[in-house]
Amino acid sequence: MSRGLLSRIATTLVLGCGCDMTPADSGPDAGPADAGPPPLTIEWSACTAAGGEVPAECADVAVPIDWADGEGPSVTVFVKRITRPDTTGQLWLLAGGPGGSGKDFESAIEEIQALASDLDLYLLDHRGTGGSDYLDCPGLVPPLGGWSQLDPARVTSCVDALTGNQADALRATRTTQAAQDLGALIATVRGPNDRVVVAGASYGTYWLHRYLQLYPTQPSAVVLDSVCDRCGQWLEYERSHDRLGRALLSECAADALCASKLGADPEAFLQALVSSATPVCPDVVRAFGTSSVKVMAGVLLENPFAQHYLPAFLYRLARCEPRDVTALTTLLSRRTSGLSRTSIATFLQVSLADLAPAPPISEVEAFEATALFSKELDFLTAIAGPVWPAAVPDPWVGSYAETTVPMLMINGVLDPQTTIEEARSFAAHFTGPEQYLVELPRTVHGAVFGSATAAPPADPMPCGAEIMRLFLQSPGTRPDTSCTEDILVGDGFSLGPEADEYLWGTTDIWEG
């Protein structure tokens, strides 16, 4: 079983981007920025990736806290590279969140190398995350009952600590500063004949787009996986989860077997679990890490495999007999441990400083009172917003890059985090002859590796990854997308006996 499959079985990062569109002009003139930043000093040392299995090189690189003041203090950003003989350039990978780091790609290193066989890989940690100077608030962790249970005093303590110990770094943890870090790093390490491809996922596409605004001619090509334009509308993000989740339950109601388990009204079945006055199935709560059934449902909805099994998960969660606990904990054990430690402080800083204002708490409470699917990030930002330090508005926000570089935009039609409607709206601004939007049916977030064409434990290259591979081979040619016809379709709410046995430990996902 490859790390790539495990990463696709993994529950998606708790922090993913939700987006909204704001029509605008192209923003400030790229001007001197695109001419290239001054070179940086980089000293590489031996390290490893993918849990020690892959040799790599790492560097802590000092960059200006504020690129507008190159003589001022510095902050450290962390970059890891995986090189191979006879490559022709570099593939830079930008993680999502905001708050995730380059480590999020390491569980799929083998698969990424397969689709970018002639490129060295560079994993850059955004300011405030991973191995970069980390914005840390140890007390700001998800409450067991969900972000709705967050004590505002914890946010106040976090702000006090950050403004006391990391005030300059906090102010400079912004998308535009991170984009300038990327441009300077590429300018420093790029060889005279290297081609450079930059790929971002989720919030990483927002970061990548800001980079394109600043350096519209620097990269050879770019890939945007799960397109995130005007990110951070966290109430709309949760509404999208609820809408798509309810649509799935409607499919259950129309399926004879599923309806025989959850009843004629599956929404009522889930509502009873969400509203339960007593904890639901404590052993599963411990394995999942939350007691909120609504949050569990929201997280599972994002997973390319777990979404097929969501009705069976709810059915067994409600019954909670020993056989159910065994099956559910087996399913949850298929998650991988290769993801980075997400910086909640960086999530809040970038969300509130660069993406969108916090939603009004009254609107959040009104929506969440009836929601069945939600990760409650709307609660997190609504609670934190009133006490988080105000930021200077960024003039690049709401505008679009003017670039002709080859661009692959790829998005799942069933993505609850970065919706297909938002991807289409974003793509309308990039209509060059080598700029393509590819829509993947039956696919959720993380479309490149979340578009399986076979059920586990089989592990062929996913459709999105194959399309990206073809694009990297020939960015000037529209990639063949015929594999979209082969993207996995479940049999009702199962992926078949072999997958059921592997994921659940039984071929009877309802009763076994």
Kindly label every feature range from the protein language model.
Residues 1, 5, 9, 13-37:
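Ser/Thr-rich, Pro/Gly/Ala-heavy low-complexity intrinsically disordered linkers and tails
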Residues 304-305, 320-323, 475:
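Short helix-adjacent coil turns
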Residues 317, 322-355:
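Long, low-complexity segments enriched in small/aliphatic residues
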Residues 36-293, 349-512:
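Gly/Pro-rich cap/lid or specificity-loop segments adjacent to the active site
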Residues 278-296, 301-306, 337-345:
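Structural motif
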Residues 301-315, 357-362:
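Short helix-capping/linker segments at secondary-structure and domain boundaries
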Residues 266, 310, 324-328:
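Short amphipathic alpha-helical segments that mediate assembly, nucleic-acid/protein binding
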